[in-house]
Curated annotation (Swiss-Prot):
Domain C-type lysozyme: 21-142
Gene3D superfamilies (alphabetical): 1.10.530.10
Protein name (record): Lysozyme 1B
Active-site residues from the entry: E52, D70
Organs and tissues of expression: Expressed only in the midgut where it localizes to a few cells in the posterior region in all larval stages.
InterPro entries per the UniProt record, alphabetical: Glyco_hydro_22, Glyco_hydro_22_CS, Glyco_hydro_22_lys, Lysozyme-like_dom_sf
Catalysis performed (reactions): Hydrolysis of (1->4)-beta-linkages between N-acetylmuramic acid and N-acetyl-D-glucosamine residues in a peptidoglycan and between N-acetyl-D-glucosamine residues in chitodextrins
PANTHER family for this protein: GEO02684P1-RELATED, LYSOZYME C
One annotated GO biological process: killing of cells of another organism
Domain of life: Eukaryota
SUPFAM superfamilies: Lysozyme-like
Family membership: Belongs to the glycosyl hydrolase 22 family.
Length: 142
């Protein structure tokens, strides 16, 4: 019986990953531009998404040292920016449920990421160090 339970859970996890969206650098740049993100910021956002989630929408990061988790294509933290489904306390600065940041429709993720940037700048993402001064071109995306 334990094997059957494990098999069902594994199958559900696989199905969830199989149906989740994975962007490319260009498809993400175009989607964000369509949502009103300035073209001058798109190279930065695509670089952050590359290192945070490999352009995948469904990623929930492992527990951080404080027990918080990061969600979605931009790995938004649940201690400060989104409300986790487990009921744990959060500042919820973006006024969004963390699970909404895992959707294929990235509008909530983009809104929240822009809000985080407006409060903390690009350095809110530790991966920014990999991008700063080494941005990918998005010219061929448009």
């Amino acid at each position: 019986m334990k094997f059957i339970n494990f098999f069902v859970i594994a199958l559900m996890a696989y199905a969830n990953c199989a149906w989740a969206k994975t962007f490319t650098r260009c498809s993400l740049a175009r989607a964000m531009y369509a949502l009103g993100v300035p073209k001058s910021e798109l190279a930065r956002w695509t670089c952050i998404a590359k290192y945070e989630s490999h352009y995948r929408t469904h990623v929930v990061g492992p527990a951080n040292t404080d027990g918080s988790h990061d969600y979605g294509i931009f790995q938004i933290n649940d201690r400060y920016w989104c409300k986790p489904s487990n009921g744990r306390s959060s500042h919820n600065g973006c006024n969004v449920y963390c699970d909404d940041l895992l959707e294929d429709d990235i509008s909530e993720s983009v809104y929240c990421a822009q809000h985080v940037k407006s409060k903390q700048g690009w350095s809110a993402w530790t991966t920014w160090a990999k991008c700063n001064g080494n941005l990918p071109s998005i010219d061929e995306c448009f």
